[in-house]
Design a protein with these regions (language model features):
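Hydrophobic/anchoring residues in structured secondary elements
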Residues: 41, 90-93
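Residue-level signal for secondary-structure boundary sites
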Residues: 14-16, 60-62, 96
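Short, well-ordered beta-strand segments in beta-rich or mixed alpha/beta enzyme
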Residues: 2-9, 37-69
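Short, low-order "capping/linker" segments at domain edges
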Residues: 92-102
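Short, surface-exposed ligand-recognition loops at beta-strand->loop->(often short) alpha-helix junctions
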Residues: 9-20
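An amphipathic, aromatic/His-enriched active-site/gating alpha helix that lines ligand/cofactor pockets
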Residues: 24, 28-37, 55-89
């Protein structure tokens, strides 16, 4: 199992755009479950900060979100939407209450 947290800030006028694009990723995930992935995105109260949390459980450790075309679209112009670029860090789940399991 591999866990990753990605954080970034959008430009002040791009938070809503970013949210719409992220919502499309979740729509496609619901339609075409790639398996081996638990994924969440949070928008912080300031309206421009976002955090993505991914837990990958695949045999080879590859992240199946790369199979999602809406995610490719999300990544395509992320630099244009961001004031602070995305920073990804590996993470360790030390506890979870119904967050990563049904």
């Amino acid at each position: 199992m591999k866990s990753v947290v990605v954080q970034y800030k959008t430009k002040s006028d791009r938070g809503d755009d970013n949210q719409r694009i992220v919502e499309k990723v979740f729509e496609e995930l619901s339609e075409h479950d790639p398996g081996g992935l638990r994924y969440a995105t949070l928008r912080l109260a300031d309206g421009v900060s976002f955090a993505h949390i991914a837990v990958v459980k695949t045999a080879d450790g590859s992240n199946p979100i790369g199979q999602i075309s809406a995610f490719a679209e999300f990544q395509r112009e992320i630099g244009d939407r961001c004031a602070d670029p995305p920073a990804a860090e590996d993470a360790t789940v030390i506890g979870s209450y119904r967050f990563f399991s049904d």
